[in-house]
Amino acid sequence: MINQSIWRSNFRILWLSQFIAIAGLTVLVPLLPIYMASLQNLSVVEIQLWSGIAIAAPAVTTMIASPIWGKLGDKISRKWMVLRALLGLAVCLFLMALCTTPLQFVLVRLLQGLFGGVVDASSAFASAEAPAEDRGKVLGRLQSSVSAGSLVGPLIGGVTASILGFSALLMSIAVITFIVCIFGALKLIETTHMPKSQTPNINKGIRRSFQCLLCTQQTCRFIIVGVLANFAMYGMLTALSPLASSVNHTAIDDRSVIGFLQSAFWTASILSAPLWGRFNDKSYVKSVYIFATIACGCSAILQGLATNIEFLMAARILQGLTYSALIQSVMFVVVNACHQQLKGTFVGTTNSMLVVGQIIGSLSGAAITSYTTPATTFIVMGVVFAVSSLFLICSTITNQINDHTLMKLWELKQKSAK
C-alpha cells in the first residue's frame, strides 16, 4: 500500500527538481545565437552552426549514459540517480559560467549530457512510486514542471543576462541546483526499491531492454514517433530567433519578442500537460498522440507562414497546447509495459533512443536555417510532425493502458535461464 503523504512529498520534490533543472538549462536556449556571438566573433553561418552543435551536444552523451544510469537506478537506488543528476547539472552549470569560447561551451554541454538527466531519473522514480492507476496523471504533471521550467528559464534568462551577464546567471543557477540536490537528499524517500537480496532474478541487461522495446509493436512505434517529435521540435529551436526577428515589425526589442513567444508556448504546455495525462490514464493514448502530433505539425507550418508577431504568437500557443502530449505519452506506454523493477532501465533506454531525434534535429534545423530561411525550417519540421502520425494510424495498436508483452518477454527469459 502506497503511503500517500510520502508520495505527495516525493512528488513535490521531483516537480521542483525538474523545474529548477529545466529552468537552468533553458535560460540560454532562445538566446543561444546571441550568446555564441558574445563568446567569439563569428559569421551568421558559424553562429547557427555552433548553436546547433551546442543544442545537440548533450544528447550525444545522454544517448550513451542514459541506459547505464537507468540500470544503476534499478540496481542501486532511483533516489540517488535523481540526486546524482542534480549534482552533475550543478557542476556543469558552474563550468559553463567559466567558458570563454564556443568550443569550451560545447565540451561542457557534452559533460552535461553524461552526468545530467534529471528528467529521466525523476520519471523512473515517479513511475515506480506512483499508484498504477495515476501514472498518466503523474507523468502529465511532471511534464508541466518541464514546461514551467522552460517558461521561467528564458524569462529570467533574458532579463538577468542583460543585468548581470551570462556568467553570473549560470553561477547563480548552479548554486540553486546544488541546494535543491541537498534538499532532495534529506527529504526524498524511496519506498518501492527492493534490497538486492529480495530482488527477483530478472535479467536487467541494457541490450535486452533495447531488444524488448524494439521487438514489441506498441513500444517500437511509439518510440519511432517520439524520435520524430524530438527531431522536429529541436530542429526548430535555432530557427525561432531569426524567424521572430524577420516578422517583428513592432517597436519591441527582438529579445523581448522571443521571450514572449517562448512564454506563450510553455504557458500553454503547462496548462495542457496534466489534461493529456488524464486522457492517457483513460486508455486513449494512441488517439491522444495522433491528434496532438497532427495539430502540432499544423501549428509549426502556420508559424513558418506567419507574417506578423500576432499570427506567430497564436501558432506558438497551439503548438504548446499539443506538443505537451507527445513525449509523456511515449514514456507512459513504456513504463506501463515493463516490469516494476525495470522502470529505470526502460526509461533510460527509451530516452537513449529519443535523443537521436534531438541530435539529428538540432543539426538539421541549423543547416536548413543557414542555407534557406527560418520559415522553411518550420514548414519542414511541421510536415515531419504530421507525417509521423502515420506510424500509429497504420498500426494495429489499440487504445489500452497496459501492454504486458514486455513483462512476458522478461518472464520467459527468466524461466529459460533456470
From Swiss-Prot:
Main subcellular localisation: membrane
The protein's name: Staphyloferrin B transporter
Annotated family: Belongs to the major facilitator superfamily.
Record keywords, A-Z: Cell membrane, Membrane, Transmembrane, Transmembrane helix, Transport
CC per GO annotation: plasma membrane
Role description: Involved in staphyloferrin B secretion.
InterPro entries: MFS, MFS_dom, MFS_MdtG_subfamily, MFS_sugar_transport-like, MFS_trans_sf, Tet-R_TetA/multi-R_MdtG-like
Coiled coil: none
Transmembrane residue ranges: 19-39, 49-69, 88-108, 163-183, 222-242, 257-277, 287-307, 317-337, 353-373, 377-397
GO molecular function: transmembrane transporter activity
Keyword Cell membrane among UniProt keywords: yes
Any single Pfam family the record assigns to this protein: MFS_1
Cited PANTHER family: MULTIDRUG RESISTANCE PROTEIN MDTG
Knockout mutant characteristics: Deletion of the gene impacts growth in iron-depleted media. Mutant is partially impaired for staphyloferrin B secretion.
Record localization: Cell membrane
Protein's organism: Staphylococcus aureus (strain NCTC 8325 / PS 47)
Membrane topology listed for this record: Multi-pass membrane protein
Induction: Up-regulated under iron-deficient growth conditions. Repressed by Fur under iron-rich growth conditions.
